[in-house]
A protein has these predicted regions:
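Catalytic beta/alpha-barrel core
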Residues: 73-74, 88-102, 111-124, 135-146, ...
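N-terminal amphipathic alpha-helix/helix-capping segment at the start of soluble metabolic enzymes
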Residues: 1-22, 271-274
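Structural preference for beta-strand elements that scaffold enzyme active sites
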Residues: 19-23, 52-56, 90-94, 111-112, ...
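Catalytic alpha/beta core domains of metabolic enzymes, predominantly
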Residues: 133, 137-239
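Glycine-rich, proline-tolerant flexible connector loops at the mouths of alpha/beta enzymes
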Residues: 22, 26-35, 54-75, 239-249
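Alpha-helix-loop-beta-strand connector modules within alpha/beta enzyme cores
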Residues: 41-49, 68-94, 129-135, 185-195, ...
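Active-site-adjacent loop and "lid" segments of alpha/beta metabolic enzymes
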Residues: 67-76, 112-119, 175-182, 203-228, ...
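A cross-domain feature marking catalytic cores of carbohydrate-active enzymes
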Residues: 26, 55-59, 95-97, 117, ...
């Protein structure tokens, strides 16, 4: 059953309570036109399919491989546009924070504070996010087991916040690949919190000598289906009208026009496994 804090989060949406929820959007805020186009199309699609929806976008990418890579259009502008998408389409929003000083600022604009995988053990960051009272979604580090995420959960709870989600995004497999261990989904669910599968970042091919992370987006459907089958409560999918032109993580993104057929299959699968 969906916890009360998620029921409250999705109270403005009409959805099937037995469905998975979706966190989807571009990697980073590029401009107003892109975020509005994605927000409109995904929210309309999710309403049609009865899927609770959260719009996502980073207002700043603080962990790009190369110093020359695009990081954003400015924090204030990025957060304002994320908030504008949420207000226009009546959907909750999420973005990632990278330092404890950002937590209270981002919380004024965003409904769910996301902790990046590389920072999931940073106690000060977890506590600052928790103290905002917002839902905190912690991405499991590529270097951790699902079972070890209990310590991140404990830190947030000790700060007085029970509104927690955990996200699986794969584990390092050699120098330039990731692999998903689906045992991590039930392992993280043992903490009594919703578990999300990041279907795009789990297909990254990091540490490329070009300075640009590669990907394997043709396997997004496979990752998503397996996640639904193993009990994931939600899915995280980055999408873009033209991934080849995206300013960040284009190699991992699902083309926006391919989202509808994918979600239709996943809704059917969800009904078969619950």
């Amino acid at each position: 059953m969906m916890p009360n804090y998620l029921q409250d989060l999705f109270k403005s949406q009409s959805y099937d309570a037995n469905n998975f929820f979706l966190i989807a959007g571009p990697c980073v805020v590029e401009n107003e036109d892109i975020v509005m186009e994605i927000g409109e199309k995904v929210s309309t699609l999710c309403k049609k399919l009865g899927i609770p929806y959260v719009f996502k976008a980073s207002y700043r990418k603080a962990n790009r491989t190369s110093a020359n890579s695009f990081t954003g259009i400015g924090d204030d502008t990025g957060m304002e546009l994320i908030k504008k998408v949420g207000a226009k389409f009546q959907v909750p929003t999420t973005s990632d924070i990278h330092a404890h000083e950002e937590a209270a600022i981002a919380a004024a604009y965003i409904d769910i504070l996301q902790i990046p995988a590389f920072l999931c053990r940073q106690t000060d960051l977890l506590i600052a996010a928790a103290q905002t009272g917002k839902i905190v979604n912690v991405k499991k580090g590529q270097f951790l087991s699902g079972a070890s995420m209990k310590f991140a959960v404990d830190k947030i709870k000790l700060a007085g916040n029970e509104k927690i989600m955990l996200t699986e995004r794969g584990n390092t497999f050699g120098y330039q690949d990731l692999v998903v261990d689906y045992r991590n989904i039930p392992a993280m669910a043992e903490n009594g919190v919703p578990v999300i599968m990041d279907c795009t970042h789990s297909l990254q091919q990091p540490n490329q000598t070009s300075g640009v992370t590669g990907g394997n987006p043709q396997l997004i459907e496979t990752i998503a289906k397996a996640a639904i089958a193993t009990g994931a409560h939600g899915l995280f999918i980055e999408t873009h009208p033209n991934p080849a032109q995206a300013k960040s993580d284009g190699a991992n993104m699902l083309p926006l026009d391919k989202l509808a057929p994918l979600l239709e299959k996943l809704v059917k699968l969800r009904k078969a496994v619950i």
